[in-house]
Design a protein with these regions (language model features):
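SAM-dependent Rossmann-like transferase core, predominantly class I methyltransferases
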Residues: 1-51, 62-68, 89-90, 189-218
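Conserved Class I SAM-dependent methyltransferase catalytic core
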Residues: 8, 129-187
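Residue-level signal for inorganic ion chemistry
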Residues: 16-19, 102, 135, 149
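Conserved acidic residues
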Residues: 32, 97, 147
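Conserved SAM-binding motif I beta-strand of class I
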Residues: 55-60
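Conserved SAM-binding strand-loop segment of SAM-dependent methyltransferases
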Residues: 77-87
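A short acidic, Gly/Pro-enriched loop at the edge of an enzyme's catalytic core
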Residues: 88-99
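Mobile active-site "lid"/loop adjacent to the S-adenosyl-L-methionine
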Residues: 103-131
């Protein structure tokens, strides 16, 4: 089946695969409302429909990503609502049984987030947590009672801070999946910088990805 992955749009990677695996473990009702934050090419939103959800909303700040996700949904003949906007802003006031998030999380020399270009899909400030922390603060209000947040990121930007912030927001959070994968092009190009900051060991060539599962129990 044709799946579009144009330049400048985040294509499915190892983190996408790990999050899709965690998604596959979630029992979804047909009427479940699912949100895919930072959808990129739409791969995870499409996976949610294939997993049984019939009400899937995907969000991305990039116009190119939004158009790509819409085209991929049309090519797959699967019903997905795709909205353009920053993170959770387009769906304020709505509730979801499942939120999927694969945000930018790579530590970068620049403190500010890039405003355009492909790097918006991975650069996340000096500590890699600028976008992660916004999701940790904002996602709980969008979860229906019993709703679940599945959030994937690299251990380079800290697993415990994510768990702590989600728990502080009233969610029950734990690590659901872990996987070590070889550095991709971005981390290979940034290895010297990460090594200089003590985030990786000299000569290290793999990173650990984690999926955090957080549930709104009340």
């Amino acid at each position: 089946m044709l799946f579009l992955k144009p330049p400048g749009v985040y294509s499915p990677q190892g983190d996408t695969s790990l999050l899709a695996e965690a998604l596959g473990h979630e029992p979804l009702q047909v009427a479940a409302r699912v949100l895919d934050v930072g959808t990129g090419s739409g791969a995870l939103a499409l996976a949610a429909v294939r997993h049984g959800a019939s009400r899937v909303t995907a969000v991305d700040v990039s116009l190119r990503a939004v158009l790509t996700a819409r085209l991929n949904a049309r090519l797959s003949r699967l019903p997905i609502e795709v909205l353009r906007g920053s993170l959770l802003d387009p769906v304020r006031g709505r509730r979801f049984e499942l939120i999927l998030a694969n945000p930018p999380y790579v530590p970068a020399p620049q403190v500010r987030l890039p405003r355009r270009g492909a790097a918006r899909a991975w650069d996340a400030g000096h500590d890699g947590r600028v976008v992660l922390d916004r999701i940790c603060r904002g996602a709980p209000a969008l979860l229906a009672p019993g709703g679940v947040l599945l959030l994937v990121h690299s251990a380079l930007c800290g697993v415990e801070p994510t768990l702590d912030r989600l728990r502080e927001s009233g969610l029950d959070a734990e690590v659901a999946e872990r996987r070590r994968i070889p550095f991709g092009p971005v981390l290979r190009a940034r290895a010297a910088y990460l090594e200089g900051r003590g985030l990786i060991r000299p000569g290290e060539e793999k990173e650990e990805l984690v999926v955090i599962r957080a549930i709104r129990s009340r």
